UniProtKB/Swiss-Prot annotation:
Its main location: cytoplasm. Tetramer of two alpha and two beta subunits. GO terms for cellular component: cytoplasm. It comes from the Bacteria. Keywords: Aminoacyl-tRNA synthetase, ATP-binding, Cytoplasm, Ligase, Magnesium, Metal-binding, Nucleotide-binding, Protein biosynthesis. GO terms for molecular function: ATP binding; magnesium ion binding; phenylalanine-tRNA ligase activity; tRNA binding. One of its GO terms (biological process) is phenylalanyl-tRNA aminoacylation. This is Phenylalanine--tRNA ligase alpha subunit.
Length: 338
C-alpha cells in the first residue's frame, strides 16, 4: 500500500509538470482527488487493512493528499500568473500613440446669432427676459390689443391647445408679463421659440424670435430709430443703410417696417432683394396706449417702443443661407460650417 501511494504521488507530479491550462489542471485534480479519484479509491481500501497497518497507512494517505493539494494549488497560481503576464504582453498600450479624438460639435447658427444679438443689446442696456411657450390668450393677444376677430386668432395661423391656451405666436407676451411684474423704466429683449401654422422655404411652423421693449418717460420714435440703427450697424456693418417704412401692428402706433440695404448687392438691386436694394428684417413702433391700460401703466406719463425680428431671417442674411429649412435639418455638412 505504501508503494502504491508513493507511485500515485510520483505519477501525479509527473502529469502536473505538463499541465498548462486551468481546465487540464482541474481534470488532474478530479482524477486524483475527486470523489471517484485514484486517491479516494485507495482510501476506501483502508478498511481491508489490519488494525496495526490502518493508522500508519492513513497518515501516509493524508500526507499524499495534502502534498497533492499543495502542488496543484501552486500550479494553479502559476498558470494564473502566466495568463496575466501573457494578457499584459498582448494587450499592452503604447503610450506614445496619439489619443483618439472625440468628434467635437459646433454651436448651432441659431444659437450663434441669438447670442450675438443679445450681446449687442446688452451693450445698449437691455436685459434678457423669458416666458412660457404655452401661453394664455390674454398675454398673447388680448393684452397686446389684438381684437377678437383679428386674423392672427384664426386656427390657420395659431396652434390652439384649448379656448384660452395656445402655443405663443411671438415673444411679445414676455413684454406684457414683464410690465405686469415691474413698474417703468423697462428695457428688455425676449428671445425664444414661437409657433405658427406655416411651412415653406422661408417659413417654419416652429421658429425663433427676439422682441424688445423700452418704456420710460420721454421715449420718442427717434430713440427707437437710434437704437435699431446702432444694432444694425453692429450686426451687419457700420456702413449698412437703414430705412423705416410705415406699417401696422395692433400693439404699436405709429408702426414701421425696418429695412436694411441688401447684404448681397449692397443696395444696387439683385434677385434676393427683388431689385429693390432693400431687405426687410424687423418690425417696430411706439407702444400703443391701449397696451399700457392692460398692464396698469400711466400712458400720459410714460412712452416706449417695441420691436421684433425673426432670428432665422437674420441668420439667413448674416450667413448667406438660402433655405430656412437647412437650419432645422441637422445636416452636419451644413452645421460644421459655423
Amino acid at each position: 500500500m505504501r508503494e502504491k501511494l508513493e507511485a500515485l504521488l510520483s505519477a501525479a507530479t509527473a502529469e502536473l509538470a505538463h499541465v498548462a491550462t486551468e481546465d487540464s489542471l482541474q481534470d488532474l485534480r478530479v482524477k486524483y482527488l475527486g470523489k471517484k479519484g485514484e486517491l479516494t479509491a485507495v482510501m476506501k481500501g483502508l478498511g481491508s487493512l489490519s488494525s496495526e497497518e490502518r493508522p500508519l497507512i492513513g497518515q501516509i494517505v493524508n500526507k499524499v493528499k495534502t502534498e497533492l493539494e499543495t502542488r496543484i494549488d501552486a500550479a494553479a497560481l502559476q498558470i494564473r500568473e502566466a495568463g496575466k503576464a501573457e494578457k499584459l504582453r498582448s494587450e499592452r498600450v503604447d503610450v506614445t500613440l496619439p489619443g483618439r479624438r472625440l468628434p467635437v460639435g459646433t454651436r448651432h447658427p441659431i444659437t450663434l446669432i441669438t447670442e450675438e444679438i443679445s450681446d449687442i443689446f446688452a451693450g445698449l442696456g437691455f436685459l434678457v427676459a423669458e416666458g412660457p411657450e404655452i401661453e394664455h390668450d390674454f398675454y398673447n393677444f388680448e393684452a397686446l390689443n389684438f381684437p377678437k376677430d383679428h386674423p392672427a386668432r384664426d386656427m390657420q395661423d395659431t396652434f390652439f391647445i384649448s379656448d384660452t391656451l395656445l402655443l405663443r405666436t411671438h415673444t411679445s407676451p414676455v413684454q406684457v408679463r414683464t410690465m405686469l411684474k415691474q413698474p417703468p423704466p423697462v428695457r428688455i429683449i425676449a428671445p425664444g421659440t414661437v409657433y405658427r401654422c406655416d411651412s415653406d422655404a422661408t417659413h417654419s411652423p416652429m421658429f425663433h424670435q427676439i422682441e424688445g421693449l423700452m418704456v420710460d418717460k420721454g421715449i420718442t420714435f427717434g430713440d427707437l430709430k437710434g437704437i435699431l440703427t446702432n444694432f444694425i450697424n453692429q450686426l451687419f456693418g457700420k456702413d449698412t443703410g437703414v430705412r423705416l417704412r410705415p406699417s401696422f401692428f395692433p400693439f404699436t402706433e405709429p408702426s414701421a417696417e425696418v429695412d436694411i440695404a441688401c447684404v448681397i448687392c449692397k443696395g444696387k438691386g439683385c434677385r434676393v432683394c427683388k431689385n429693390t436694394g432693400w431687405l426687410e428684417i424687423l418690425g417696430a413702433g411706439m407702444v400703443d396706449p391701449e397696451v399700457y391700460r392692460h398692464v396698469n401703466y400711466d400712458a400720459e406719463a410714460y412712452t416706449g417702443f417695441a420691436f421684433g425680428m425673426g432670428i432665422e431671417r437674420i441668420a439667413m442674411l448674416k450667413y448667406g443661407i438660402s433655405d430656412m429649412r437647412l437650419l432645422f435639418e441637422n445636416d452636419l455638412r451644413f452645421l460644421k460650417q459655423f
